[in-house]
Regions:
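Metallo-beta-lactamase
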Residues: 2-5, 99-154
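Conserved beta-strand hairpin/beta-sheet module of binuclear metal-dependent hydrolase folds
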Residues: 2-60, 64, 156
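Active-site environment of divalent metal-dependent phosphoester hydrolases
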Residues: 17, 77-82, 104-107, 150-151
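Conserved residues at beta->alpha junctions
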Residues: 39, 47, 76, 101, ...
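Short coil/turn connectors at secondary-structure junctions
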Residues: 40-41, 68-69, 93-94, 121-123, ...
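Active-site metal-binding motif and surrounding structural segment of the metallo-beta-lactamase
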Residues: 51-99
Length: 158
């Protein structure tokens, strides 16, 4: 779905779930939001629940049209947002991951089989600073830490 000429929605819809966070009724299901920003550098914003990895990767691939993403920005490590990180990095192994220090700590804990086998070279990850900026070209991503708004590693990007 096109948000603008440079921003594309690549998320997926889960019509099977009836409770969000195990307690809030969602009679129409819910969305796992993910976006691609197409610029001189390409950023993919977040991943999706593991049950939807294949559909999401297909959405990403379609939007990229043969290009390789430069960045994968991970704003939150709860599994419904992060479960597709290993599959994404297997498909796009040269992509640089951007997250908080705590986010990277969680990645190592959640995906030890992936990070222990393949690792993530220092040049392939960026610890986003609070109030930090990542330049994509005409677009700039600004990072704001929001620990404990939901989980301890959360950051927002605008």
């Amino acid at each position: 779905m096109e948000i603008s000429t440079c921003v594309k929605y690549v998320g997926v819809n889960d019509h099977q779930v009836d409770l969000f966070e195990g307690q809030y009724k969602v009679p129409n299901g819910m969305s796992y939001n993910s976006y691609v920003i197409l610029d001189e550098k390409i950023a993919v914003m977040d991943t999706v629940d593991g049950f939807f990895t294949e559909e999401w990767l297909n959405n990403v691939e379609q939007v990229l049209s043969g290009k390789t993403p430069d960045y994968l920005v991970i704003q939150h490590m709860e599994p419904d947002h992060s479960a597709s990180i290993p599959a994404f990095l297997k498909k796009y192994p040269k992509t640089t991951v951007v997250s908080t220090a705590k986010g990277f700590q969680f990645m190592e804990q959640f995906f030890p089989e992936f990070f222990a086998v393949q690792g993530l070279p220092a040049e392939q990850h960026i610890v986003a600073a609070n109030d930090g900026v990542l330049e994509l070209g005409q677009h700039s991503l600004h990072f704001v830490y929001a620990p404990m708004v939901h989980w301890p590693e959360v950051m927002m990007t605008y």
